[in-house]
């Protein structure tokens, strides 16, 4: 009886952890994407709270993202200028307080793709519940598993287009 109860308990814990920490089924979903961007371009549509990685032939991979709060959104073009695993983070208002990479309290999550211009990045998160919202200071937040997928697909120099 104990063995059955323990198995049932473990199953419930596993399912609860999976539901809370997982991206929805649409994460990295291949979709039609009719726009004039070259394969390999990242397009962020802040109004949709979606990031598209253009794969070519009218197709893209679509990811849910968190974007800038009201007054913190931006639009324009950039390039990926750095790729970091377990990046450290410092608050823009207090750069002396650094949260080390890999810390559960680090809002950058497991990886970051920094953007030219020096202010913004596409990165993971320690708050998966924030994905799909207007939540950041201008950065593009992704589920950790999604940013790792994108991280493996792109290189320094990848073009990024952010639209409203």
Describe each model-derived feature in a short phrase.
Residues 1-12:
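Bacterial N-terminal signal peptides that target proteins for export
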Residues 5-7, 17, 48:
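Extracytoplasmic entry segments of secretory-pathway proteins
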Residues 73-75, 137, 155-157:
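Short edge beta-strand segments in beta-sheet-rich domains
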């Amino acid at each position: 009886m104990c063995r059955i109860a323990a198995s049932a308990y473990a199953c419930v814990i596993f399912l609860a952890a999976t539901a809370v920490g997982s991206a929805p089924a649409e994460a990295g979903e291949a979709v039609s994407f009719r726009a004039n961007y070259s394969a390999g371009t990242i397009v962020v549509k802040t109004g949709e709270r979606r990031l598209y990685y253009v794969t070519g032939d009218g197709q893209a991979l679509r990811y849910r993202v968190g974007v800038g709060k009201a007054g913190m959104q931006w639009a324009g073009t950039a390039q990926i200028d750095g790729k970091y695993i377990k990046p450290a983070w410092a608050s823009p208002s207090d750069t002396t307080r650094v949260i080390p990479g890999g810390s559960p309290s680090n809002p950058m999550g497991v990886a970051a793709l920094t953007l030219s211009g020096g202010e913004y990045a596409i990165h993971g998160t320690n708050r998966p519940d924030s994905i799909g919202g207007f939540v950041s200071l201008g950065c593009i937040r992704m589920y950790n598993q999604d940013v790792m997928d994108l991280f493996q697909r792109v290189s320094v120099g990848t073009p990024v287009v952010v639209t409203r």
